[in-house]
Swiss-Prot record:
Catalytic activities: UDP-N-acetyl-alpha-D-muramoyl-L-alanyl-gamma-D-glutamyl-meso-2,6-diaminopimeloyl-D-alanyl-D-alanine + di-trans,octa-cis-undecaprenyl phosphate = di-trans,octa-cis-undecaprenyl diphospho-N-acetyl-alpha-D-muramoyl-L-alanyl-D-glutamyl-meso-2,6-diaminopimeloyl-D-alanyl-D-alanine + UMP
Molecular function via GO: metal ion binding; phospho-N-acetylmuramoyl-pentapeptide-transferase activity; UDP-N-acetylmuramoyl-L-alanyl-D-glutamyl-meso-2,6-diaminopimelyl-D-alanyl-D-alanine:undecaprenyl-phosphate transferase activity
EC number: 2.7.8.13
Keywords: Cell cycle, Cell division, Cell inner membrane, Cell membrane, Cell shape, Cell wall biogenesis/degradation, Magnesium, Membrane, Metal-binding, Peptidoglycan synthesis, Transferase, Transmembrane, Transmembrane helix
A Pfam family recorded for this sequence: MraY_sig1
Membrane topology: Multi-pass membrane protein
Protein family (similarity comment): Belongs to the glycosyltransferase 4 family. MraY subfamily.
Cell inner membrane recorded as keyword: yes
Taxonomy, superkingdom: Bacteria
InterPro entries per the UniProt record, alphabetical: Glycosyl_transferase_4, PNAcMuramoyl-5peptid_Trfase, PNAcMuramoyl-5peptid_Trfase_CS
Pathway noted in the entry: Cell wall biogenesis; peptidoglycan biosynthesis
Name listed for the protein in its UniProt record: Phospho-N-acetylmuramoyl-pentapeptide-transferase
CDD domains assigned to the protein according to its UniProt record, in alphabetical order: GT_MraY
Length: 419
């Protein structure tokens, strides 16, 4: 909104009004504003949640310090959502299709998570919203994102190709024409590009249609999987919040370089016109998560609940799809994914061994993976992996997972220059 106001003021030749035309300036304002909003309104929202007795119910899993969390306010994801949306609405261009998709993602998954938390708190159902309804919401969002990216005429890219001399890359050339494309960025392949339409040996319109059908299916899987993995990661104070902030920084960098033709040329990635506005959203996302971490760090004064975790995961997934970096998520979202996979592997192995031997066995002492490190090796749990033998304090597990996230974020950026 402020963009349009200052655009009008610039026409009146108001000194300094042109600043709002610079994405870098608006991004800087966005992160500061989001950070201030999260810290200032966060305290007030926490007090209201506490007075309304909107507290977390805790199951006794035998974890150190677990029962002390009972009654801690939940639904704190509202702080994150508000702190993302207000800077975005004020500073970003609202005629940009990518910004509109991110706003829809934030509101839709925020509402889905809020409904889940509401059922847990007020209807006293620990399982919350039935899993099938969560999946329907996530699949529906992924389908919407895929279809909009397919059908909206503003969603285009400029394809890149290498110009070689003596077998060496001399420069990267961008085609003048902006095209609809099912290409995505992936390291270790020619031009760092991979086209979904090339999977099957098809030609013409059939090939194009197949590429978009596959892209929509990938969008559905990515949104559903990453949002659920983020939800499972939110089990230790500050873990999901800090990990999301790290991922958000990388996504902000990707959005900026993808919309800057010289930087895109240097990194040999596709140029995406209009993606620069996503930088503002990403900085608001980072500011909101860091601000929320002020209250969510150990010992947490508030939990984000599904209101926050589903939203964070969905935002990361949709953002990556828009800037065509979804194939980098296994590296960038490594912490989220190993948390989710640990649960899937545990359930699969338990059911498999129970069917074969009549007694279910475990690989990990407890899942998601962060709980495995909270359990000592002599806890009497029959699990294939018993190390570490000593329980690790919650705060140390969180910091170590953050460090892993930072390392994987650096590797993600580095892959763009690998040939």
């Amino acid at each position: 909104m402020l963009y349009y106001l200052f655009d009008y003021l610039e026409k009146l030749q108001l000194p300094g009004a042109r600043l709002f035309h610079y994405v870098s300036f608006r991004s800087a304002v966005a992160i500061v504003l989001a950070l201030l909003l999260a810290t200032v309104i966060g305290n007030r929202i926490i007090e209201r949640l506490r007075k309304a007795q909107i507290g977390e119910t805790i199951r006794d899993l035998g974890l150190e310090g677990q029962l002390s969390k009972k009654g801690t306010p939940t639904m704190g994801g509202l702080i994150i959502i508000i702190s993302i949306l207000i800077p975005t609405l004020l500073l970003a261009r609202l005629d940009n299709v990518y910004i509109l998709l991110m706003i829809v993602t934030t509101v839709l998954l925020g509402s889905l998570g809020f409904l889940d938390d509401y059922i847990k708190v007020f209807r006293k159902k620990k399982e919350g919203l039935h899993g099938r309804y969560k999946i329907i919401g996530q699949v529906g969002l992924g389908f919407i994102i895929g279809i909009v990216l397919y059908m909206n005429p503003a969603v285009v890219i400029k394809e890149n190709s290498e110009v070689l001399r003596d077998g060496q890359v001399e420069r990267v050339h961008f085609n003048k024409q902006e095209v609809k494309s099912t290409k995505t960025t992936i390291p270790f392949v020619k031009n760092n590009n991979f086209d979904y339409a090339d999977i099957l040996p098809l030609e013409g319109k059939t090939k194009v249609l197949f590429g978009w059908i596959l892209f929509v299916c990938v969008a559905v899987v990515v949104v559903t999987f990453i949002s659920n993995c983020a939800n499972l990661t939110d089990g230790l104070d500050g873990l999901a919040t800090g990990s999301s902030a790290i991922i958000g920084v990388v996504l902000a960098i990707f959005a900026y370089v993808s919309s800057h033709i010289e930087m895109a040329s240097y990194l040999n990635i596709m140029f995406i016109p209009g993606a620069e506005e996503l930088t503002i959203f990403a900085f608001a996302f980072v500011g909101a998560t860091i601000g929320f971490l002020w209250y969510n760090a150990y010992p947490a004064q508030v939990f984000m609940g599904d209101t926050g975790s589903l939203t964070l995961g969905g935002i990361i997934a949709v953002f990556a799809l828009i800037i065509r970096k979804e194939m980098l998520l296994p590296i960038l979202c490594f912490v989220f994914i190993i948390e989710g996979l640990s649960v899937m592997i545990q359930v699969f192995y338990f059911k498999l061994t129970k069917r074969r031997t009549g007694e279910g066995r475990r690989i990990f002492k407890m899942t998601p993976l962060h709980h495995h490190f909270q359990k000592p090796g002599n806890a009497g749990i029959d699990a294939w992996l018993q190390k570490p033998m000593q329980a690790i304090p919650e705060s140390k597990i969180t910091v170590r997972f953050w460090l892993v996230g930072i390392i994987m974020a650096a590797i993600t950026i580095a892959t763009l220059k690998m040939r």
